Regions:
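Short hydrophobic beta-strand segments
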Residues: 18-20, 82-88, 168-169
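Hydrophobic alpha-helical membrane-insertion signals
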Residues: 7-32, 166
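Active-site neighborhoods of enzymes that stabilize oxyanions during catalysis
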Residues: 2-5, 11, 119-193
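Active-site-adjacent "gating/activation" loops or surface patches in catalytic cores
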Residues: 191-202
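Aromatic- and Gly/Pro-rich amphipathic surface segment
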Residues: 38-41, 45-76
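Conserved beta-strand scaffold positions in the cores of enzyme catalytic domains, especially
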Residues: 18, 44-46, 112-114, 167, ...
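Short, glycine/acidic-enriched loop or turn micro-motifs at the edges of active sites
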Residues: 23-25, 51, 172, 202
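Thiolate-centered catalytic microenvironments shared by cysteine-dependent enzyme domains
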Residues: 60-159
Length: 202
């Protein structure tokens, strides 16, 4: 993953596409979209992680299909050749999920970055924020899937026996060990057999 610093973004703010992908766990009662409307980095576009995930399934935040992704990004005014900086204002680093989506759907990895420290660091450094609406000109974004980047349940089940690859769980150690309930209703506690816990907050 490519990180860029706040000073770099400030200097290059007019030459990159900026995405706010703030998302919060339901129990926080916070809305990334409402917070974006209140203040965001100038020229940034909001990426709604809930709205831009697959809706025909009862699991949250599953990837949409290739055509739908192209439509979503076209409406955001992003071209295939654009350099992109993604940030968030959340405790779950949702910008990294948005980054993965772009990589999975074929955007050049050298052109997709995450802002180190996110909006919190940007504001702490007294850099400019706004509530102005960003003008968007629709594009014709072309996407393709790098399906090797995602494993399905059958592949993970087989891997428990065959050990073809390592499985890393980025949740907290308490959730990994099943000592606390999952924050989303209907999900069992615990972890995949033989997986490793490396919490994203480290």
């Amino acid at each position: 993953m490519s990180l860029v610093e706040t000073d770099w973004l400030e200097k290059n703010i007019s030459s990159v596409k900026i995405i706010d992908c703030s998302w919060h766990m339901p129990q926080t009662k916070r809305s990334g979209l409402e917070e974006y409307k209140n203040q965001h980095i100038p020229n940034s576009i909001f990426f709604d992680l809930d709205a831009n995930s697959k809706k025909e399934i009862n699991l949250p935040h599953m990837l949409v299909d290739q055509n739908e992704w192209g439509q979503i990004i076209s409406k955001m005014g992003i071209d295939n050749e654009d350099e992109i900086v993604i940030y968030d204002n959340s405790d779950v680093i949702s910008s990294c999920r948005c980054w993965f989506n772009f990589i999975y759907f074929g955007h050049n990895p050298k052109l997709v970055h995450v802002l180190n420290g996110g909006l919190k660091k940007w504001i702490k450094e007294n850099k400019e924020v706004t509530n102005d609406v960003t003008n968007i000109k629709t594009t014709d974004y072309k996407s393709f899937e790098k399906k090797e980047l995602v494993k399905n349940k059958e592949q993970v089940d087989l891997n428990i026996e065959e050990q073809y690859f390592k499985v890393i769980d980025a949740r907290s150690k308490e959730r990994f060990d099943g000592k606390v309930p999952e924050p989303r209703k209907g999900l069992r506690s615990g972890s995949i057999k033989d997986s490793f816990c490396i919490p994203f907050g480290l």
